């Protein structure tokens, strides 16, 4: 696994689309993460964005949803020769699903130093005991992906401060 794999114009195009999908998550109050699954002919076969809050489902991460959609579209849970683009480094749960789906390649934008399973926090695919290997390319549009998340969490913190101040002012009356 080499994080410095060559990034193509197509990789950037798909990551920009994943960022658009992340906007859908944000519009729903979800953490803005988007994912796009592409087959070897460069056709989009699955897409997803975070829906854990909306669906009350801790597994409804963008990656999982994109993999599920892709599997349904090709009617096979093995997503051989496909590439998954995701705006944030996958967590361990998503890394497990990625492994089982047998995708050929993973491309992600921002690193996740809290829960990232592809090198930032954990090294899920580096274990020699894994029964599948895949190519990983990291850092595609990393700045844009990271900024989207930073802006979201900054806004969320500001909203919490306002809410807390409002509750305090109401309790003081």
UniProtKB/Swiss-Prot annotation:
Signal peptide: none
Domain CMP/dCMP-type deaminase: 9-121
CDD domains: nucleoside_deaminase
Cofactor comment text: Binds 1 zinc ion per subunit.
EC number assigned by the record: 3.5.4.33
Catalytic activity as recorded in UniProt: adenosine(34) in tRNA + H2O + H(+) = inosine(34) in tRNA + NH4(+)
Family: Belongs to the cytidine and deoxycytidylate deaminase family.
Quaternary structure and partners: Homodimer.
Its job: Catalyzes the deamination of adenosine to inosine at the wobble position 34 of tRNA(Arg2).
Name of the featured protein: tRNA-specific adenosine deaminase
Native source species: Haemophilus influenzae (strain ATCC 51907 / DSM 11121 / KW20 / Rd)
């Amino acid at each position: 696994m080499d994080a410095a794999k060559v990034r193509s114009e197509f990789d950037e195009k798909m990551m920009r689309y994943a960022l658009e999908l992340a906007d859908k998550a944000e519009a729903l109050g979800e953490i803005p993460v988007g994912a796009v699954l592409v087959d070897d002919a460069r056709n989009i076969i699955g897409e997803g964005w975070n829906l854990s809050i909306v669906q009350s489902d801790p597994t409804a991460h963008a990656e999982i949803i994109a993999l599920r959609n892709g599997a349904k579209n090709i009617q096979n849970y093995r997503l051989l020769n496909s590439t998954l683009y995701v705006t944030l480094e996958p967590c361990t749960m998503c890394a497990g699903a990625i492994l089982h789906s047998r995708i050929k390649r993973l491309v992600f934008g921002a690193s996740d130093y809290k829960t990232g399973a592809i090198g930032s926090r954990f090294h899920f695919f580096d274990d020699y005991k894994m029964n599948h290997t895949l190519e990983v390319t990291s850092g595609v549009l990393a700045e844009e992906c990271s900024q989207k998340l930073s802006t979201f969490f900054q806004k969320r913190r500001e909203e919490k401060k306002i809410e807390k101040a409002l509750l305090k002012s109401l309790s003081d009356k």
